[in-house]
């Protein structure tokens, strides 16, 4: 019986590590309803992107923020269709910080970015893509950041 309980707990913990948040699902649903058009400039990524008021900063209504806090490269691949189908003029991509924080290998992050680039090359070749490097995360103000984010300097360098 003890083994069954331990196995069940391990399975639940494993599933939780792959689970997306309610916030993620809500943002994905919202983005599926908001169209991307051919003259749009899309910012795609995680919380760094999500937190930016890009349309206001650039004073351009064609700038669309498609960042979702805590997003990972694999999850991002699952939500590309509405963006690719809109054939945006430009795409700015910043992803990978959260992948590295949960132990996803730099090679897997790079492979996911390559898959994204391949899809755009095939389905929206006129979209100009800017792949932004993963920003370094230091140990300053570690109480406000999960510790797994600020111990990944080597992985960030390798991924970039």
Residue map of PLM features:
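Positively charged n-region of N-terminal signal peptides that target proteins for export
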Residues: 1-4
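Substrate-gating cap/lid alpha-helix
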Residues: 139-160
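N-terminal signal peptide c-region/cleavage motif recognized by signal peptidases
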Residues: 14-16
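Charged helix-capping and loop-helix junction motifs
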Residues: 106-116, 153-160
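Serine-esterase "nucleophile elbow" of acetyl-processing enzymes
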Residues: 18-90
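Cell-envelope and extracellular/periplasmic
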Residues: 67-71, 92-100, 114, 134
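A short helix->loop->beta-strand "cap" motif at the edges of active sites that frequently abuts
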Residues: 124-128
């Amino acid at each position: 019986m003890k083994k069954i309980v331990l196995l069940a707990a391990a399975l639940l913990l494993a599933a939780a590590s792959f689970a997306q948040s309610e916030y993620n699902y809500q943002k994905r649903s919202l983005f599926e309803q908001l169209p991307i058009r051919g003259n749009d400039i899309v910012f795609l990524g995680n919380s760094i992107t999500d937190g930016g008021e890009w349309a206001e900063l650039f004073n351009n209504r064609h700038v669309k923020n498609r960042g979702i806090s805590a997003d990972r490269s694999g999850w991002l691949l699952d939500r590309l269709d509405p963006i690719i189908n809109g054939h945006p003029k430009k795409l700015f991509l910043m992803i990978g910080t959260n992948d590295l924080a949960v132990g996803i290998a730099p090679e897997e992050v790079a492979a996911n970015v390559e898959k994204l680039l391949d899809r755009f090359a095939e389905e929206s070749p006129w979209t100009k893509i800017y792949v932004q490097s993963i920003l370094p995360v230091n140990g300053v103000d570690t109480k406000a950041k999960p510790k797994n984010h600020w111990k990944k300097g080597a992985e960030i360098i390798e991924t970039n």
